Amino acid sequence: MNIRERYQEIEKSFLHPKSCLSSQTKGRLKPEPEDDIRTPFQRDRDRIIHSKAFRRLKHKTQVFFSPQGDHYRTRLTHVFEVSQISRTIARALRLNEDLTEAIALGHDLGHTPFGHAGEAILRELHPGGFEHYEQSLRVVDILEKNGKGLNLTFEVRDGILKHSKGRGKILSDEPFTLEGQIVRVGDVIAYINHDIDDAIRAGIIKKNDIPQQFLKFFGDRHSKRIDKMVRDVIFTTIKEDYEKISMSPEMEEMVHSFRDFLFEKVYYNERIIEEFKKAKRMLESLYNYYLDNPHIIDAQELEEKELHRKICDFIAGMTDRYALYTFEKIFIPKSWAVP
């Protein structure tokens, strides 16, 4: 019995009966030999961490575009916070922590530069539309490793595809595994808490602007809010016998209301909307430039449908700073150097 097999025996004896055991994975798109040390979900996590798309997240917007301060969240710090919250829930529930971590780290790989501004403009311009969660799956299935993809397990791919979506339902049994459902909830817990912190730091709102009903219910500090939400998820799920990852009705209602407050006061704030519009115009200019000059991205031989797809993939993969650099290089006149 090798190291992986011993660990999988530990999973069988320790994890909850409704957990997803690594030995019972539905497998990969392309079958491959098992590793003698790592389980399939551990390998998926490692492949995600070592991918180029994962490294690019450090220069992609969470809410505030290319912030000058050092303490604002980026898309990379966001996925780490989602991972931490989700792993805490998974461990407390005796669910598969490795699977949970892999989904959490991979769930935003398809996010565009400039956050949801990039997603919105690509949705308008690309004939097939655009959703970042679908793009995340496309990244791991096709785009990474020069078109070979990461060949992740079904369970991780399912969790990536079905994580939380904007103002959609927080709780859902859409993800095939309970671990995927954890990440869906963990994503919301992470962003509604860190985005409110960043909004206060940026002067978009003041702490006193947060309604007293939220401060009284969740607590007045970042750590208190997260702790209360996480505990509610854990104990409600246990109480409901793991039917699905759950929140108490009161908590779910308050989280929805708190998220609505964020949309109204932060995401739809005039200052953010103005920057949102600028980012959309910039990315639209780049998109149309590549349509007119497909040779720049080696796409001159492609039919129109494939050309749109390649441009969409190219722009979605950009970081904020690379998009700014490219726009400046193409559209901003340079001063003439005197010999």
From Swiss-Prot:
The keyword Hydrolase applies. Disulfide bonds: none annotated. PANTHER family: BIS(5'-NUCLEOSYL)-TETRAPHOSPHATASE, SYMMETRICAL, SLR1885 PROTEIN. It comes from Thermodesulfovibrio yellowstonii (strain ATCC 51303 / DSM 11347 / YP87). This is Deoxyguanosinetriphosphate triphosphohydrolase-like protein. NCBIfam families: dGTP_triPase, PRK01286.1-2. Coiled coil: none annotated. One of its GO terms (biological process) is dGTP catabolic process. Keywords: Hydrolase. The keyword Transferase does not apply. Belongs to the dGTPase family. Type 2 subfamily. One of its GO terms (molecular function) is dGTPase activity.
